[in-house]
């Protein structure tokens, strides 16, 4: 009898949770509820930022996990572009069909410090070989974050011209 009561309670709780999430999803999709929480002022990109990266993680919520807790090699200057407030973070984490797909979402400006070093005229041809792409920056960040933290981060990087003021990619249709 005891196991029957506890499993019955579990099933009722699970059913209530399922109904609640379905109703909340329907309310958001129908436009009755809007989950737009902007907790920080829009920051201007640093002068030398050429890239913007979106980092999603199921375990690391704070931007410091990706800025001050990681030393990037080769040298990258990573600064926060946008971070969601606590309510939006929990929504992204708990609701798998949210924009975050069950993960905390943070965005960052990234400057490649080595590309900013002034070069002599003799270096001009060689400097083109050292120009990194957004995919190169993603690979560097992925290697450094996953070896120095336990964040298990999913990273996407874009050229700075291809993102909005929250460093999220803009669609080509806009």
Swiss-Prot record:
Signal peptide positions (record): 1-26
Induction: Expression is highly induced in filaments that grow at the water-air interface when repellent gene rep1 is absent.
Keywords: Glycoprotein, Secreted, Signal
Main location: secreted
Localization, UniProt: Secreted
Glycosylated residues (UniProt): 77
Disulfide bonds: none
Subunit: Secreted cysteine-rich proteins (SCRPs) are predicted to form amyloids.
Physiological role: Secreted cysteine-rich protein that might form amyloid strutures which are involved in attachment to hydrophobic surfaces and in formation of hydrophobic aerial hyphae.
Protein name: Secreted cysteine-rich protein UMAG_00792
Source species of the chain: Mycosarcoma maydis (Corn smut fungus)
Lineage, broadest ranks: Eukaryota, Fungi, Dikarya, Basidiomycota, Ustilaginomycotina
């Amino acid at each position: 009898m005891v196991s029957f009561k506890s499993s019955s309670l579990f099933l009722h709780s699970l059913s209530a949770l399922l109904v609640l999430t379905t109703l909340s999803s329907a309310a958001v999709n129908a436009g009755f509820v809007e989950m737009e929480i902007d907790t920080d002022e829009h920051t201007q990109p640093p002068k030398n930022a050429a890239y913007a990266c979106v980092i999603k993680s199921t375990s690391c919520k704070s931007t410091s996990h990706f800025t001050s807790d990681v030393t990037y090699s080769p040298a990258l200057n990573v600064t926060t572009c946008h971070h969601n407030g606590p309510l939006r973070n929990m929504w992204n984490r708990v609701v798998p069909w949210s924009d975050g797909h069950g993960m905390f979402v943070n965005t960052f400006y990234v400057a490649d410090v080595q590309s900013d070093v002034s070069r002599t005229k003799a270096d001009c041809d060689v400097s083109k070989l050292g120009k990194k792409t957004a995919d190169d920056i993603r690979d560097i960040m992925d290697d450094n974050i996953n070896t120095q933290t336990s964040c298990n981060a999913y990273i996407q990087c874009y050229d700075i011209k291809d993102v909005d003021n929250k460093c999220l990619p803009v669609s080509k249709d806009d």
